């Protein structure tokens, strides 16, 4: 998937000036307009391929579907709650964020919240401003020796752990992705959730808002917690069930909470905010000069690197694309798309299961990015729903009635060589199998249904190819085919054949353009098809 035609970027929220400068220095045109209504945003996006936002702009399905040229949405920050990911993915719009840009600021705010909870600093400050001097009311607790439960051990969770360990806190945590060994390497004991609840004096959450994390702290889990537990949420509103938290505060099960985020922002229900044991901020996790500068810089660099084909980072809705930018993988992406296009032309809108098989050590983990490229080739001509690309391929293939499986086999000795890297695309239960490889940076077709091409056939983007199977002993076949090309006004640019397989030979002709019809050809050969990717 190329982004070379991405030329104009709209920045619709306030960002550090470095963002605009980096984009412009990278050759991109930039428009900055803030506080746009939905209608105004749609109007501005009509001639923009890229959009960069913070949290204020709502990139809804209506906006995405109405922005015909939109290719990429960049979120200068971590959370993408304000972007409709499903709509973006369906439209084939890439969504990126800056996962590390505000990590330090969010971690520092979390640590500040923990200290404020322990010593009731905001409440004591408010009391002093009211002219009071009440030392007994604000009795606190030391952090030293207390147990901190960290739910989510990504960058922010790790930074929090390091800082609070310096206060003498014991850190335990939970993360379904991070292994116990990795967690132990930064001083966190990984435990199942049911063991964390009764163990912790303080709990802080640092997970994304997902169906599996919504209401992670609820009536049931609060009941399992140590009485007097204190809770911090500087991640996403909704991870802590706000109703359950209020009930736990009212009963004394929870001694205090520090909230930087809410299910609804700003919160209309003031019960939590007004509770005397709640510290709250208006979503300030990334509100530092350093974080804003870092996020603006990172998202701009990501856009420029993407357009120049250097790298792709921070991808939210198509992680497989990240591999597509490596020099080794790029030509294999082209091969996969070519074989998918070939399979569609050959099998005629196939149904059932498409098998994508990689072979060779260097392709061991490549299936995740090659299978979407195969799908692009399969569906590009058939799909009437949207432009098929590496972002939406897996979503659209299911709707097309196809199942795509990916597997890997090691390189084996044989005619292809020892350990040679190959890509096979086949239709399960049907006589359609194509095998390709990459020579240098050029995708090559090596085999069709066991018929080997020596040398291999170059598969070049934009080069029409006609493939047909016929008996090798027919002396008039080739002159007849050339005559049919002449009648259609199509030039023959290249020609080669496979070895004989099952009594037939595959012939491949490079053409100046695709033929308007293959009906005349099919009268003279066993089968024929043409394609161009």
UniProtKB/Swiss-Prot annotation:
The lineage of its organism: Eukaryota, Metazoa, Chordata, Craniata, Vertebrata. Signal peptide: none annotated. InterPro entries: ASB_dom_sf, D-isomer_2_OHA_DH_cat_dom, D-isomer_DH_CS, D-isomer_DH_CS1, D-isomer_DH_NAD-bd, NAD(P)-bd_dom_sf, PGDH, PGDH_ASB_dom. The gene is Phgdh. It comes from Rattus norvegicus. It is an enzyme of class 1 (oxidoreductase). The modification Phosphothreonine is found at residue 78. Disulfide bonds: none annotated. The keyword ATP-binding does not apply. Belongs to the D-isomer specific 2-hydroxyacid dehydrogenase family. PANTHER family: D-3-PHOSPHOGLYCERATE DEHYDROGENASE (PTHR42938:SF22), FORMATE DEHYDROGENASE 1 (PTHR42938). Homotetramer. GO terms for molecular function: NAD binding; phosphoglycerate dehydrogenase activity. This is D-3-phosphoglycerate dehydrogenase. Catalyzes the reversible oxidation of 3-phospho-D-glycerate to 3-phosphonooxypyruvate, the first step of the phosphorylated L-serine biosynthesis pathway. Does not catalyze the reversible oxidation of 2-hydroxyglutarate to 2-oxoglutarate and the reversible oxidation of (S)-malate to oxaloacetate. GO terms for biological process: G1 to G0 transition; gamma-aminobutyric acid metabolic process; glial cell development; glutamine metabolic process; glycine metabolic process; L-serine biosynthetic process; L-serine metabolic process; neural tube development.
């Amino acid at each position: 998937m190329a982004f070379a035609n991405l030329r104009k970027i709209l920045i619709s929220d306030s960002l550090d000036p470095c963002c605009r400068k980096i984009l412009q220095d990278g050759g991109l045109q930039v428009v900055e307009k803030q506080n746009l209504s939905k209608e105004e945003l749609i109007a501005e996006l009509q001639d923009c391929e890229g959009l960069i936002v913070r949290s204020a702009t709502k990139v809804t399905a209506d906006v995405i579907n109405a922005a015909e040229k939109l290719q990429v949405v960049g979120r200068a920050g971590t959370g993408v709650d304000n972007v409709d990911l499903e709509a973006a993915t369906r439209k084939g719009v890439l969504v990126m964020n800056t996962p590390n840009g505000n990590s330090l600021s969010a971690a520092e705010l979390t640590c500040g919240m923990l200290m404020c909870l322990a010593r009731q600093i905001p409440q004591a400050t408010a009391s002093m401003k009211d002219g009071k001097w009440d030392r007994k009311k604000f009795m606190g607790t030391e952090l030293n020796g207390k147990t901190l439960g960290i739910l989510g051990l990504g960058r922010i969770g790790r930074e929090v752990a390091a800082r609070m360990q310096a206060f003498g806190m014991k850190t335990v945590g939970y993360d379904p992705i991070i292994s116990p060994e990795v967690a132990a390497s930064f001083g966190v004991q990984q435990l199942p959730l049911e063991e964390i609840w009764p163990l912790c004096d303080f709990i802080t959450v640092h997970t994304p808002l997902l169906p599996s994390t919504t209401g992670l702290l609820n009536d049931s889990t609060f009941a399992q917690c140590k009485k007097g537990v204190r809770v911090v949420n500087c991640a996403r509103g909704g991870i802590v069930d706000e109703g359950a938290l209020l009930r736990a505060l009212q009963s004394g099960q929870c001694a205090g909470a520090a909230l930087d985020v809410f299910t609804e922002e700003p919160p209309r229900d003031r019960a939590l905010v007004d509770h005397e044991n709640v510290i709250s901020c208006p979503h300030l996790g990334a509100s530092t000069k350093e974080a804003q500068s870092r996020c603006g810089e990172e998202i701009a660099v990501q856009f420029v690197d993407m357009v120049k084909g250097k790298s792709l980072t921070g991808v939210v809705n198509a992680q497989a694309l990240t591999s597509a930018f490596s020099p080794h993988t790029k030509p294999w992406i082209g091969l996969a798309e070519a074989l998918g296009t070939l399979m569609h032309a050959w099998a005629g809108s196939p149904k059932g299961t498409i098998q994508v098989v990689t072979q060779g050590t260097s392709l061991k983990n490549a299936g995740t990015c090659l299978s979407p490229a195969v799908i692009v080739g399969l569906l590009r001509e058939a799909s009437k729903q949207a432009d098929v690309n590496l972002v939406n391929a897996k979503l659209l293939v299911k709707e097309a009635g196809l199942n795509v499986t990916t597997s890997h086999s090691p390189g084996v000795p044989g005619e292809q060589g020892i350990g040679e890297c190959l890509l096979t695309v086949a239709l399960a239960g049907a006589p359609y199998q194509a095998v390709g490889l990459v020579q240098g940076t050029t995708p090559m077709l090596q085999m069709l249904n066991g018929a080997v091409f020596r040398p291999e056939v170059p598969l070049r983007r934009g080069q029409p190819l006609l493939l047909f199977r016929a008996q090798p002993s027919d002396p008039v076949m080739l002159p007849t085919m050339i005559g049919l090309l002449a009648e259609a006004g199509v030039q023959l640019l290249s020609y080669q054949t496979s070895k004989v397989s099952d009594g037939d030979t595959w012939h491949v002709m490079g053409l100046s353009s695709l033929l308007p019809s293959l009906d005349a050809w099919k009268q003279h050969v066993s089968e024929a098809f043409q394609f161009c990717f």
